[in-house]
Swiss-Prot record:
Similarity comment text for this entry: Belongs to the OMP decarboxylase family. Type 1 subfamily.
Keyword ATP-binding: no
Organism annotation: Opitutus terrae (strain DSM 11246 / JCM 15787 / PB90-1)
PROSITE patterns: OMPDECASE
Chain's role: Catalyzes the decarboxylation of orotidine 5'-monophosphate (OMP) to uridine 5'-monophosphate (UMP).
GO cellular component: cytosol
SMART domains listed in its UniProt record: OMPdecase
GO molecular function: orotidine-5'-phosphate decarboxylase activity
Gene Ontology biological-process entries: 'de novo' pyrimidine nucleobase biosynthetic process; 'de novo' UMP biosynthetic process
Reactions it catalyzes: orotidine 5'-phosphate + H(+) = UMP + CO2
Coiled coil: none
Active-site residue list: 61
Protein name: Orotidine 5'-phosphate decarboxylase
Length: 230
C-alpha cells in the first residue's frame, strides 16, 4: 500500500514559512493547514499554499450541530482543498449530513473523521467520561464514521492495525503522531516511526516539527520519503 507524506504548517501564516515552503514544494506534495493558520488568515492561506503547488489538507476538526457542520463543509468545498476533517464524536447524524454535503458540493473532496487525538491517553479519556481504551474508542468511532458515509479517518499510528481489521480496505487512514527515531515526541503520546506506520497500513503520514526543525528541511523530508519507499 502506497504511503505519502503530509507536511504540517505550524505557523500563523504561509508567509512566515514561505522560504521553506517553496524549497519543499518540489519534494512534498501535501500540506496541512490547521486551526492556528486558518484562524489567523482564513481562506487566503489555503489559496496561497495551493498556489505553491501543494494539495491542501484543511484540518479544522468541525464539531457542531448537523446543519452547521454541513454548511461549513459546503463553504469549505469552494476552496482549493483535497481533504477536510470533522470530529467523529459529533455523532452519526452530524457526520451523515456532512458526508451528504460533501458528495453534493465536492465529490472529489475526502472528508476525514478525527477519532481520538494523539495527545490523549486512556487517562485523558477517562477524565471526559470514556471508560474504554483509546484503541476501543477509535474502532467504535471509526465504524460509526464509515456507517455514516465517511471514507477516511484520522487516527494515531497505534490504531492503524485495529482499524484495518475492522473496516473496509478502501478506507483512507491519515496518521499524525509520526516521529523519526531520533525526534522528540513533543505533546503526542501515541507515536510511531514513519516506516512502522507505513508497514502497518497508513495511507498518509502527518509530520511537521521533525521537518521544519531539521537543519536541512528538504533533506529531512527526502529521508522520510525514502524510508516510506524502502
Amino acid at each position: 500500500m502506497a504511503c505519502d507524506l503530509i507536511l504540517v504548517l505550524d505557523a500563523p501564516s504561509p508567509r512566515d514559512i514561505a522560504p521553506v515552503l517553496k524549497r519543499l514544494s518540489g519534494t512534498v506534495r501535501w500540506a496541512k493547514i490547521g486551526l492556528e493558520m486558518y484562524t489567523a488568515c482564513g481562506p487566503d492561506c489555503v489559496r496561497e499554499v495551493a498556489d505553491l503547488g501543494y494539495n491542501v489538507f484543511l484540518d479544522l476538526k468541525l464539531h457542531d450541530i448537523p446543519n452547521t457542520v454541513a454548511k461549513a463543509v459546503e463553504s469549505a468545498a469552494r476552496l482549493p482543498i483535497k481533504m477536510l476533517t470533522l470530529h467523529t464524536c459529533g455523532g452519526r447524524e452530524m457526520m451523515s449530513w456532512a458526508a451528504k454535503a460533501q458528495q453534493q458540493h465536492a465529490p472529489e473532496l475526502l472528508l476525514l473523521g478525527v477519532t481520538v487525538l494523539t495527545s490523549m491517553s486512556a487517562v485523558h479519556l477517562h477524565e471526559v467520561g470514556v471508560p474504554d481504551s483509546p484503541e476501543a474508542q477509535v474502532v467504535r468511532l471509526g465504524r460509526l464514521a464509515v456507517d455514516a458515509g465517511l471514507r477516511g479517518l484520522v487516527c494515531s499510528p497505534l490504531e492503524i492495525a485495529p482499524l484495518r481489521a475492522a473496516l473496509p480496505s478502501d478506507v483512507t487512514l491519515v496518521t499524525p503522531g509520526i516521529r523519526p527515531r531520533d525526534a522528540a515526541a513533543d505533546d503526542q503520546t501515541r507515536v510511531m516511526t514513519p516506516a512502522e506506520a507505513a508497514r502497518t497500513g497508513a495511507n498518509f503520514l502527518v509530520i511537521g516539527r521533525p521537518i521544519f526543525k531539521a537543519p536541512d528541511p528538504v533533506a529531512a523530508a527526502r529521508d522520510i520519503l525514502a524510508e516510506l519507499k524502502s
